[in-house]
Amino acid sequence: MHSREAIEAYYRAVGTRMAGLPVYNPALAVELLGWRAVEGVGALGVLITPWCMNLFWQPPAEAELPTKGERAVLSLPSGDYECTLHEDESLGRYASASLCSPMQDFPDQAGARAMAEEVLRLVFAESEPPQPAQLTRRALFRRALGGAS
């Protein structure tokens, strides 16, 4: 797993080529939030850049995935996320799912960070099993006697 610092450094270097393009928001900086190892999945976080916000996934080296440019599904307890696979000399194999692009709706880093933190909260949330309907005693007896519930 690459370090948060290495991934941020890579995207800061990419940012030097993106600066000046209409999609580039100079009020924002590169920041990888929530970067953590996830058992059986690899590592995952939300990457903020001045031009996009992505769910950033680095699968384990042994993972069998399609080739670069194709799509793969990241399965987490909160749901399935479709990601595009990338391969880079310095970062190796990783995948991303676009959350926002361009980033002009964010006036500052704090706003982008707040959205990224909410995405992390949702992505790492356990899905809740459906709750059984509350059964009253009256409904239970009605059902037992063959009546409608």
UniProtKB/Swiss-Prot annotation:
- Listed name of the protein: Hydrogenase expression/formation protein HupT
Give the InterPro entries listed for this entry.
Answer: NiFe-hyd_HybE (IPR023994), NiFe-hyd_HybE_sf (IPR038530)
Report which gene this protein is encoded by. Answer: hupT
One matching Pfam family? NiFe-hyd_HybE
Regarding protein family, the annotation reads: Belongs to the HupJ family.
